[in-house]
């Protein structure tokens, strides 16, 4: 008489949903940036509870297969882009190199007086006349970076007069004040409520922050605060002797 083999436990319902969605993505039925059915439609399709469907979508988002945009829907994620950590490149150039479309939305472009933090970043006296810009960069209409930049007005006097929907601050600054030195500080941060809204992410979604300072000869040209959603971007650097 043979011993009866124990039966393996059936997969949880949310795992079945995850597997079905993953198969559609990996087989190419659903391609990057395709909008997938809504939670209500998936509930009707699978016959599972909304809580089960929500868990499946949440885990697939955490795994990088889906992107959920509040008030818009859930989309198939693009494979994560890479940003050069040690090489200073334009975000537009990185996106175009992946054969994707770049778009920039300019939120703020102003002349102001440097506060303590800005003055320290640019190594100028507090109250010095500077330029300040704030913009969001999109890759195939998905927000991938908030660029918050302050610029030394004495070094780049025409900064405010450029069309940054046609060129990037990086490209313009590289032309006017060629880069001779750069500094990167990278950290994991939690975005503010305003930043979450701009990036279409949830309150506790992880983000990567690069604080970048660039020099031309002996002058600090600009200090940029570059915020990336962690689920849509990764940094890659290479160095050697």
From Swiss-Prot:
Cited CDD domains: WHTH_GntR (cd07377)
Protein name as annotated: Histidine utilization repressor
DNA-binding region: 39-58
Domain of life: Bacteria
Entry function: Repressor which binds to the hutP region in the histidine utilization (hut) operon. It blocks the expression of all the hut genes in the absence of inducer.
Gene name tied to this protein: hutC
Xref: SMART domains: HTH_GNTR (SM00345), UTRA (SM00866)
BP-aspect Gene Ontology terms: L-histidine catabolic process to glutamate and formamide; L-histidine catabolic process to glutamate and formate; negative regulation of DNA-templated transcription
Pathway: Amino-acid degradation; L-histidine degradation into L-glutamate [regulation]
UniProt KW keywords: DNA-binding, Histidine metabolism, Repressor, Transcription, Transcription regulation
């Amino acid at each position: 008489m043979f011993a009866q083999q124990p039966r393996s436990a059936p997969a949880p319902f949310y795992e079945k949903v995850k597997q079905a969605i993953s198969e559609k993505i990996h087989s190419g039925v659903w391609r990057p940036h395709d909008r997938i059915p809504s939670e209500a439609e998936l509930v009707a399709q699978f016959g599972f509870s909304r809580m089960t469907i929500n868990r499946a979508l949440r885990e697939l988002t955490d795994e990088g297969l889906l992107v959920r945009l509040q008030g818009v829907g859930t989309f198939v994620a693009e494979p994560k882009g890479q940003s050069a950590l040690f090489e200073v490149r334009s975000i537009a150039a990185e996106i175009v190199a992946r054969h994707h479309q770049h778009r920039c939305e300019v939120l703020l472009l102003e002349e102001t007086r440097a506060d303590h933090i800005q003055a320290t970043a640019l190594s100028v006296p507090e109250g010095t006349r500077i330029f300040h810009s704030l913009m969001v960069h999109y890759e195939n209409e998905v927000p991938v970076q908030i660029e918050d930049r302050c610029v030394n007005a004495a070094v780049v006097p025409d900064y405010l007069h450029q069309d940054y929907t046609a060129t990037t601050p990086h490209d313009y600054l590289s032309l006017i004040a060629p880069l001779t030195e750069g500094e990167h500080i990278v950290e994991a941060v939690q975005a503010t409520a305003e930043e979450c809204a701009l990036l279409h992410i949830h309150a506790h979604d992880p983000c990567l922050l690069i604080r970048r300072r660039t020099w031309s000869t002996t002058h600090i040209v600009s200090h940029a605060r570059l915020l990336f959603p962690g689920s849509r971007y990764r940094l890659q650097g290479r160095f050697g002797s």
